[in-house]
Amino acid sequence: MATEINIGENIKKQRARIGLSQEDFAKKSGVKYTTLTKIESNVIRKPSVMIMSKIAKAFGVSIEDLLK
């Protein structure tokens, strides 16, 4: 059975690691605050590639790194 990747949890951990609030990270990444909160709380389980690209760029990592 394949392990399900929790993208929202990965993003939340990365954001907390760099010490940014959801609001501050939303501004930094260019992703709407409401979208970010929905991703982190798994309301949005599969964000678009464009959203993932913005988030990855703000962290300075690849999209693939967010999926690990």
Region spans (language model):
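DNA major-groove recognition helix of helix-turn-helix/homeodomain DNA-binding modules
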Residues: 50-65
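Residue-level preference for short helical/loop micro-motifs built around acidic side chains
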Residues: 9, 24-27, 65
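Residue-level detection of the helix-turn-helix DNA-binding "recognition helix"
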Residues: 12, 16, 30, 41
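Alpha-helical residues within the helix-turn-helix
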Residues: 16, 27, 57
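Key DNA-contacting residues within the recognition helix of helix-turn-helix
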Residues: 12, 37-38, 67
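A short, Lys/Arg-rich alpha-helix, primarily the initiator
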Residues: 1-17
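Short alpha-helical DNA-recognition segment
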Residues: 20-38
